[in-house]
Amino acid sequence: MWSRNVRLLGSWTRSYMVPATKRKTIPVYPPVQRIASSQIMKQVALSEIESLDPGAVKRKLISKKNKDRLKAGDVVRIVYDSSKCSYDTFVGYILSIDRKQLVQDASLLLRNQIAKTAVEIRVPLFSPLIERIDLLTPHVSSRQRNKHYYIRGTRLDVGDLEAGLRRKK
């Protein structure tokens, strides 16, 4: 009895398996020829920067070659174009200047204290909403660092900058 069942099991085939009758061939194509790079992104960036900053004023503000450039530690006022947006002017201490590979992506990180609350804002430098950037107070020469992140929450932290400027006048 047992030997009869073994013979029957050996002759069964699985119903989901289909026997292969011929070999599959997968076509292999030659590699695509590379076209010489024409630096399209650089050309687009140059045309875009000319429309965003026609007088090169903002480029001079962050240029490392310019002696009167913005540096970490400066106090600046960002004035927005009132016809394009409803933002108020913002006075802030520059914590860092982020220069990117494409110049038009550069931004400023500003810090101020408003109603006893520390506020940080990242301002894209070449935004069409910005009318002008005024330098109010140059940096303190004793803090010569590229980034001033270390002042957060210490005695060096900024107070209410607008109130301080009003008191100086």
Curated annotation (Swiss-Prot):
SUPFAM superfamilies: Translation proteins SH3-like domain (SSF50104). It is found in: Mitochondrion. GO terms for cellular component: mitochondrial inner membrane; mitochondrial large ribosomal subunit; mitochondrion. Pfam families: Ribosomal_L19. One of its GO terms (molecular function) is structural constituent of ribosome. The keyword Ribosomal protein applies. Residues 1-16 form a transit peptide. Keywords: Mitochondrion, Ribonucleoprotein, Ribosomal protein, Transit peptide. Component of the mitochondrial ribosome (mitoribosome), a dedicated translation machinery responsible for the synthesis of mitochondrial genome-encoded proteins, including at least some of the essential transmembrane subunits of the mitochondrial respiratory chain. The mitoribosomes are attached to the mitochondrial inner membrane and translation products are cotranslationally integrated into the membrane. bL19m is essential for respiration. Present with 4150 molecules/cell in log phase SD medium. Belongs to the bacterial ribosomal protein bL19 family. This is Large ribosomal subunit protein bL19m.
